[in-house]
Amino acid sequence: MYVRNLTGSFRFSLSFLLCFCLFVPSIYAIDGVYHAPYGIDDLYEIQATERSPRDPVAGDTVYIKITTWPIESGQTAWVTWTKNGVNQAAVGAAFKYNSGNNTYWEANLGTFAKGDVISYTVHGNKDGANEKVIGPFTFTVTGWESVSSISSITDNTNRVVLNAVPNTGTLKPKINLSFTADDVLRVQVSPTGTGTLSSGLSNYTVSDTASTTWLTTSKLKVKVDKNPFKLSVYKPDGTTLIARQYDSTTNRNIAWLTNGSTIIDKVEDHFYSPASEEFFGFGEHYNNFRKRGNDVDTYVFNQYKNQNDRTYMAIPFMLNSSGYGIFVNSTYYSKFRLATERTDMFSFTADTGGSAASMLDYYFIYGNDLKNVVSNYANITGKPTALPKWAFGLWMSANEWDRQTKVNTAINNANSNNIPATAVVLEQWSDENTFYIFNDATYTPKTGSAAHAYTDFTFPTSGRWTDPKAMADNVHNNGMKLVLWQVPIQKWTSTPYTQKDNDEAYMTAQNYAVGNGSGGQYRIPSGQWFENSLLLDFTNTAAKNWWMSKRAYLFDGVGIDGFKTDGGEMVWGRSNTFSNGKKGNEMRNQYPNEYVKAYNEYARSKKADAVSFSRSGTQGAQANQIFWSGDQESTFGAFQQAVNAGLTASMSGVPYWSWDMAGFTGTYPTAELYKRATEMAAFAPVMQFHSESNGSSGINEERSPWNAQARTGDNTIISHFAKYTNTRMNLLPYIYSEAKMASDTGVPMMRAMALEYPKDTNTYGLTQQYMFGGNLLIAPVMNQGETNKSIYLPQGDWIDFWFGAQRPGGRTISYTAGIDDLPVFVKFGSILPMNLNAQYQVGGTIGNSLTSYTNLAFRIYPLGTTTYDWNDDIGGSVKTITSTEQYGLNKETVTVPAINSTKTLQVFTTKPSSVTVGGSVMTEYSTLTALTGASTGWYYDTVQKFTYVKLGSSASAQSVVLNGVNKVEYEAEFGVQSGVSTNTNHAGYTGTGFVDGFETLGDNVAFDVSVKAAGTYTMKVRYSSGAGNGSRAIYVNNTKVTDLALPQTTSWDTWGTATFSVSLSTGLNTVKVSYDGTSSLGINFDNIAIVEQ
């Protein structure tokens, strides 16, 4: 966003502000009185002239807040009013305070009963003369009613209707239960019985008794207790409770706020929640990841910096650690209270707009796990729209790039520094009036109904944009795409601007703007971003088509590739009207969806691989492609909040997420922050840098690596940035495959640990590590000065992505992460499709080509039988790679699908005795260079522990067998060392080095090792003992098991292996090789191996 919010202690309508600005004080008069019952319906800021509360409930004390002006003695304010049509005694307003040119008053009308109708008028005068009046205003008092019992049920074969009895009043509520899937229950409650109830599947059976009714599908059993009423949901066994409503004898469950007859203002439900339950999701949230103990608002809001519990993306969908989710099917404001009213209860309440036909409508979503719950939610609200491959490279953006020369310079800088970008985003490209015409373009204005073609414009050589089409061509010729900024407003300005004025006149005449509820156009309130501007009604098809026609030339003539759709949090007030028949209070959350959807669909109608990049939305937003986390400062705290936002967004079904890495605004990031942010952003769904301009100060604020290097003085920033962006391009085949899985299933790419491992309670509070796709665990360093990172590894075996060190899971480890290091772990059993450069280097220069591979590679970490579905967009289909590990037979088999190009397997095993493809023995090469020059063959890398198997193009599947292999050794240099050091000064070691100085009493190296099953294993110790025969004590799980003889080796450059049998327990074991009282001689220590017998 490039135009900042205006703030103030309170806000008035623009006309009211103008009356203050133009006021010339009268000495003996009152010039005005003002009261606005709802203000602008801002959830977070109550204006000084509102009614309190805005919507009174029985028992509330009602205050009428008033202002008069100017400030003069002798003024009086009061309220005249009626109750249920009967005149009441006038209520004088008490003076509260003076501020600026205004006096503020407050009148106490008292409390009321449900059903009371109050009409009031506000008055003010001075010394009993010159009276000013505003009003009348009306409100109807409501009160809570709830379901008490069920009188009867009706099975309609595709839905069951429960006829309910309320605890009070004369309404005849109906509860409609239906199933949209075997594990998804939809609950609709019509308090008046007049709402439109939906049908579902005929996939259930009903069992009814006088006291209970059971609804049964293959995956759920739903119990209805009739008196008192309560819903409970069980697993298919009918005894394992998943969730239940709160006992209505203690606290109401299903309830509604009503006047008793024709108004339903709010609807809600309450569920029992044991203290062990956690709550996640609710949209994009920046503060607490675990929401228990919090109230969460579903309210789209533009908070510039320091978002905390406010959000651009509010989604009424939550995940519960007990294995289910609840989606409240409403775009009105709603609130979730999560163990705040009662410590063993959560509830959700939704506004309704007041109609008698209003309903509570929510889905109870179950699944095999929480990922399945998110997938089921996507089935209801829409699957994520698939992204083109270019969306997953680096996006470059800066508000300093306000002219063509700067864009070309940025492209040149990226290329010259080997930084592979795939997108350029421009915010400061357009004039400040139409927002669709390039700055400094000259043209003849058209009527508001007409659209410009690119040829209508002339671009002066002295202007900022001398040839936009040539610029777009340059972007494309460098393998990148061009995205332009947009906002959904028709801007108001105090000075004329012909084209804008023509557009506004036509927009107004055609009723294309959002209405104000009084026959005119809604204008954004004073004090808000783009105040007094019109807002396009994107629910109006004609309006949408007209709006987009103005922007057609950007595709047709310039050749852009998408839009950055900023803003959208611009609907203030409940009375605004839309073409779809909805009003402002129902459209505030929904408006960004309509806006972004319009741009997204239009862009993709112009180019199949176009995208939209947006900030705000609500349920279903995932169908509108990419979202970023809004405007944040360049601090470690904001970094942490951004990652939290990404995790909560992903828990809410939004898979394609990004942030302005290292922050958008504020103090320029330090080198440390910039590097740490780079590391994390390289493993985010979408990677981008962007920044706010510092205006005319002359200080360049762009967050590009070349500017960051210049600003911080750290001359390693560019190379560091290049390493991580190239690593991202190495992983692009994996990232793009995971993205396809996200669009197919709704399961996000960036997964909170609690989403991936919901049964492991250790994961619930982890917000500084996450899964990137199904195979990679990312643990960014997010605290200033931190170099030892605590990382929780869930059960299973994990491998350090960079170094190959093995780490058994089910525990927290400490990882040394220097400022240039990002901890990344791979699960055993993973298969990673990659694109590596000519030297097979991860992080080496690879370029930004999306249509070819330099070295297509598949990294395989064997464990049992695993498969991976690789999205081969170049080859045109999804292909499945299968790994079958049989270490008991000393064999690993990889089934490679038909791929019409050369590819290389990188299999994480010990060195094979031989490798075959299709039964034929392959040629072994002694160096990677030799293999690179060959068409096929294999090579073993003793450092990385990968067997490289190079395969040619094949029109059929290929079976590759590695013979004589076992699980990779545990390297001594990665063990827990005491009294020893590491070295590389002798040849023949494996891994990255060996343990040296292993020569005095107490020296030891400990390993955490993992085995699939308890039993006897062969343990091998690889060592060098050039000075004579040595020995070491071996401890397993703190028990000494043997003194291992280590016969002399020929020299310190030769290595021996000592072997013995050892009993190991299932899972994690600790093995320590120690110099104790029975040990002798100094040795060099390379590794240990655990071999199945």
Curated annotation (Swiss-Prot):
E.C. number(s) listed in UniProt: 2.4.1.387
Protein name: Isomaltosyltransferase
Enzyme active site: 566 (nucleophile), 569, 631 (proton donor)
All residue ranges annotated as the CBM6 domain in the record: 968-1091
Activity modulation: Strongly inhibited by Hg(2+) and moderately inhibited by Cu(2+) and Pb(2+). Other metal ions, Tris and EDTA have almost no effects.
Keyword Glycosyltransferase among record annotations: yes
Main localisation: secreted
Cell location: Secreted
InterPro entries: CBM6, Cellulose-bd_IV, Gal_mutarotase_sf_dom, Galactose-bd-like_sf, Glyco_hydro_31_C, Glyco_hydro_31_N_dom, Glyco_hydro_31_TIM, Glyco_hydro_b
pH behavior: Optimum pH is 6.0. Stable in the pH range 4.5 to 9.0.
Pfam families attached to this UniProt entry: CBM_35, Gal_mutarotas_2, Glyco_hydro_31_2nd, Glyco_hydro_31_3rd, Lmo2446-like_N
Signal peptide location: 1-29
Function: Glycosyltransferase involved, together with CtsZ, in the conversion of alpha-1,4-glucan into a cyclic tetrasaccharide (CTS) constructed from four alpha-glucopyranosyl residues. Catalyzes the alpha-(1->3) transfer of the isomaltosyl moiety of alpha-isomaltosyl-(1->4)-D-maltotriose to another alpha-isomaltosyl-(1->4)-D-maltotriose, resulting in alpha-isomaltosyl-(1->3)-alpha-isomaltosyl-alpha-(1->4)-maltotriose formation. In addition, the enzyme catalyzes the intramolecular cyclization of the product, generating the cyclic tetrasaccharide cyclobis-(1->6)-alpha-nigerosyl.
PROSITE patterns linked: CBM6
Entry keyword Transferase: yes
Gene3D superfamilies documented for this protein: Galactose-binding domain-like (2.60.120.260), Glycosidases (3.20.20.80), glycosyl hydrolase (family 31) (2.60.40.1760), Golgi alpha-mannosidase II (2.60.40.1180), Immunoglobulins (2.60.40.10)
Molecular function via GO: carbohydrate binding; glycosyltransferase activity; hydrolase activity, hydrolyzing O-glycosyl compounds
Keywords, sorted A to Z: Carbohydrate metabolism, Glycosyltransferase, Secreted, Signal, Transferase
Family matches, as PANTHER family: HYDROLASE, PUTATIVE (AFU_ORTHOLOGUE AFUA_1G03140)-RELATED, MALTASE-GLUCOAMYLASE
